[in-house]
Amino acid sequence: MDMAQYQPGQRWISDSEAELGLGTILAQDGRLLTVLYPATGDTRQYALRNAPLTRVRFAPGDEVTHFEGWKMTVREVEESEGLLVYHGLTAQNEQCTLPETQLSNFIQFRLASDRLFAGQIDPLPWFSLRYHTLERRSQLLQSSLWGLGGARAQPIAHQLHIAREVADRMAPRVLLADEVGLGKTIEAGLIIHRQLLSGRAGRVLILVPENLQHQWLVEMRRRFNLQVALFDKERFAESDASNPFEDTQLALVALEWLKEDERAQDALFAAGWDLLVVDEAHHLVWHQDQVSAEYALVEQLAEIIPGVLLLTATPEQLGQDSHFARLRLLDPNRFHDLEAFRRESEQYRPVAEAVQELLDHGSLSAGARKAIHGFLGSEGDELLASVEGGDEEARSRLVRELLDRHGTGRVLFRNTRAAVQGFPQRELHAYPLPMPSQYEELPAGEHPDLYPEVNFQQQWEDGDDNNRWWRFDPRVEWLIDTLKMLKQFKVLVICAHAETALDLEDALRLRSGISATVFHEGMSILERDRAAAYFADEEFGAQVLICSEIGSEGRNFQFAHHLVLFDLPAHPDLLEQRIGRLDRIGQRHTIQLHVPHLENSAQQRLFQWYHQALNAFLNTCPTGNALQHEFGPRLLPLLDGGEDKAWDALLAEGRARREALEAELHSGRDRLLELNSGGAGEGEALVEAIEEQDDDFALPIYMERLFDAYGIHSEDHSENALILKPSEKMLDAGFPLGDDEGVTITYDRAQALAREDMQFLTWEHPMVQGGMDLVLSGSMGNTSVALIKNKALKPGTVLLELLFVSEAVAPRALQLGRWLPPQALRCLLDANGNDLAGRVSLETLNDQLESVPRVSANKFVQAQRDVLAKQFDVAEGKIVPRHEERVARAKQQFAAAMDEELARLTALKAVNPSVRDSELDSLRTQREEGLALLDKASLRLEAIRILVAG
């Protein structure tokens, strides 16, 4: 096409994305062509010289459709200033004119028949690959696991329940407040991933404290294959774009930088986001008479971004005022009065007790009956009567109804270790060691005893190895001896500083020959991946991984259960973060904590504080942050000295205060909230479904077909792992292999969790989805001719196999794929026009087929062209009733689902103000638009296979 012939208003179709419907040329600007696809609302820009577009030009005899729905048969085509005008007759035989600008956006084309008659006949395996790709894509879009089963994480019930519950809402606004170690970041990642896959969100902004940026980057990339753009002062300043944020689907920004840079704030406000995620939201300070700059900034963003996820510490840790401040960000109209919020919270206590009695399966107390009646009225009385009659389904429904009406149950999710099973025990091993004379001679400074080696690292940076600190520090000798005793186990060593980690690696290598690898913030993500993989390798890997404080963020090593704390961090939250590298749900062994410390030093006193006052080694310490604030000013001076009597008194006071706070937390536990957050059994069903999907061989079988078709060479790497490399016959350089040199993959979840250097292939992985997109967006496989060897068929008999796709073209956010996913409808015509597809499967046919040389195949097609064209129409006549039946069923199911959810939320709003009006309005709009687009669902000829008996 001559570039000058592109004109605004012309209609073109994408060769690679036919599902977008008819495109309209918007503009030709320099070397770029802009095309709008009104059916889906998408806009694409193409390089002018090689735009993958085909001009839509109907011929006399073709039937065309106006965007209002009426049809006409073309009699004449006129061209005026580059635009086509069609003249013809309506169904009522009335003359009419239809400019191409007014064509329906939903028209589809028989590209398969065009290619067949043009002699473009594909290799035999491609037809099957296209069919299986269509079938699998259809199943995936309907799957309840879509967006939940592909994460590199152990499937955990409460996480999956929260992710599905939140991600399936339009513009969710919720608070994730699980206790430490329960995986809030994974929950957020699952929600982001599912929202992106479903189309409910297109652009996501993640705000985090600066020290957590790397953790988020690693978690999103490693666990969810989400490519997040990390923005900081330098990247923002270096960008040539008028708004650097606008070209980014997923942006990660540090709150500390953002609050200081007004230009960045303005750009962020103008960029247009669908979902805002804020980590460590409890650090946003709010009081009734004053708010912090960080809180005000997040508040502004929350006002203009439809969806908001706040990740925060548990409400009990924060206190009710601070907790109210987070809820106020989510819905300022609902949470506007702190005192009213306090009163409302008290009302739910008797309901929680009633739910607990229901779950205990005992007889209900009078108080429980009263609470249920007060909360649910006559509906509750009916369910209660059924429960007493032994109806277990009624019991489950009654629990669900009570949970649904819980005041903050729709906006707040909080799981506790007490409510979630599966955590390991911890054992503590303390090793007091003598203070070396070299450290005793150090000048007084800011707690030099905590990290005394730092002074020697600075002093002897380029000095004699014999004088290095690790030659005389008794902790190093102890470490070598301990590692030798534990030589059959993997051991994780964590210390505060990167320099210390590097020194320890030197010490182990030079003094003992123990194989160790390091992990610190100065390494690239790729270098850390390699170090983690070397540590994880059971056969040839390192026994020891030495991590710095920051370097270990975001990494979990559950395959190890021995943790050496070479020194102690100055904050209890950091201590919990260290232990959390091993102490996760799914850890199969008791965590062995090894803590060396120097006697009569700050190290020893900090150990005593954490152990005796906070009990932070043997249990998680939800009160640690509060106790640090309360006791910090008195604790720090006593670490370096002070009388033993004063120290013992502080330990006793700290222990008493911790026990009092823990008692308050326990009595204040919101059991109703815990039950709602845990999912009351729904999460367990999702876990079972994911495990069943993991055990299915469908994905490896499909991927082998895909690799063969595209010329990707696969070879064994080790058990459950393959190496993929592009071969000399690689068909498409655009295949999403991820690395031109090759990649190592595994389909095994356990292997993927232990080996982060391997790609974990699931149906959601970009390589799998990208490969499927390549198949369906291209034309390969939509024409094929084969010889069928079957004694029951007379030689020369022709069978015609056609694949039609029944689909609704719609914006992804409407989720119509759940009710009417694109589905291949197969027709197998014999010479008499009978459809044999119901009796003869595609796989049965495949076993009887042989390839035909392309030249011979083309000669046959051209000779039979007129006969084949008529049979296409016969086949379409057979398929249309099936398509119409699918559409009718989809409309019925879609309307029923929407009506049920509208009724539920409307009833809920009467008793639970946390249901927003915007949610109801959005659902009503979604219902109307969805039904209208289902009415326009189309049928297109996707692929043709001609079978000649021989």
Swiss-Prot record:
Residues 165-333 form the Helicase ATP-binding domain. SMART domains: DEXDc, HELICc. InterPro entries: Helicase_ATP-bd (IPR014001), Helicase_C-like (IPR001650), Helicase_RapA (IPR023949), P-loop_NTPase (IPR027417), RapA_C (IPR022737), SNF2-like_sf (IPR038718), SNF2/RAD54-like_C (IPR049730), SNF2_N (IPR000330). Pfam families: Helicase_C, RapA_C, SNF2-rel_dom, Tudor_1_RapA, Tudor_RapA. Signal peptide: none annotated. GO terms for biological process: regulation of DNA-templated transcription. It is an enzyme of class 3 (hydrolase). ATP binds at residues 178-185. The keyword Magnesium does not apply. Its EC number is 3.6.4.-. SUPFAM superfamilies: P-loop containing nucleoside triphosphate hydrolases. It comes from the Bacteria. Gene3D superfamilies: 2.30.30.140, 2.30.30.930, 3.30.360.80, 6.10.140.1500, 6.10.140.2230, P-loop containing nucleotide triphosphate hydrolases (3.40.50.300), Tandem AAA-ATPase domain (3.40.50.10810). A motif (DEAH box) lies at residues 279-282. Keywords: Activator, ATP-binding, DNA-binding, Helicase, Hydrolase, Nucleotide-binding, Transcription, Transcription regulation. One of its GO terms (molecular function) is DNA binding. CDD domains: DEXDc_RapA (cd18011), SF2_C_SNF (cd18793). Interacts with the RNAP. Has a higher affinity for the core RNAP than for the holoenzyme. Its ATPase activity is stimulated by binding to RNAP. Transcription regulator that activates transcription by stimulating RNA polymerase (RNAP) recycling in case of stress conditions such as supercoiled DNA or high salt concentrations. Probably acts by releasing the RNAP, when it is trapped or immobilized on tightly supercoiled DNA. Does not activate transcription on linear DNA. Probably not involved in DNA repair. Belongs to the SNF2/RAD54 helicase family. RapA subfamily. This is RNA polymerase-associated protein RapA. It comes from Pseudomonas aeruginosa (strain LESB58). The lineage of its organism: Bacteria, Pseudomonadati, Pseudomonadota, Gammaproteobacteria, Pseudomonadales. The gene is rapA.
